[in-house]
Every structure is written in C-alpha cells, then in structure tokens.
Amino acid sequence: MNFIQIAVLFVLVAVALARPQEDPANLPAPEAAAAPPAAAAAPPAAAAAPPAPPAPPAAAPQAAPAGGSGRKKNVNHNVITIG
C-alpha cells in the first residue's frame, strides 16, 4: 500500500470510531413484537388459494463447449489503480 492509501484508510477508521454509538436501551421496540398475536391468525380454509399447477419437467443440461466454459479467466474489473 502506498502512503495515500494508508492515509485514506486511517481517516476512514478514525471517522468510524469517532461517530457516536446508539444505546440499544433507548431504541423503540420493533412493531412486529408490539402487534397482538391475534392479528397474525391464519385465514379460514375456505379462503385458501387453490394449489399451484405442477412445474413443467426440467430441460436436459447442455454440455460445455469444447474450448472450456467459454468464460474469460483471470479478469478482475473491480481493481482501482491509484498512481
């Protein structure tokens, strides 16, 4: 790592540590836990949806091309070069 990358990393860590941390005791209760259990009752059997039709049979897997998988190897587009 060069000096600029180390300096940026140091600044990011310092900013993350300097942020005030929230106290979990002061956070409000989640709404799902506050809801009464009767609200989550199951619908009656008459209102249930009909079962879905069966899925069509899966197609046979295709063989890989003779030259390999066809994908380029050793390519990383997520590299950022500084300097």
UniProtKB/Swiss-Prot annotation:
Gene Ontology cellular component terms for the protein in this record: extracellular space
Ranges annotated as biased composition (Low complexity): 28-49
Keyword Magnesium attached: no
Keywords: Signal
Signal sequence segment: 1-18
Described purpose of this protein according to its UniProt entry: May be a male specific regulatory factor.
Official protein name in the record: Male-specific opa-containing protein
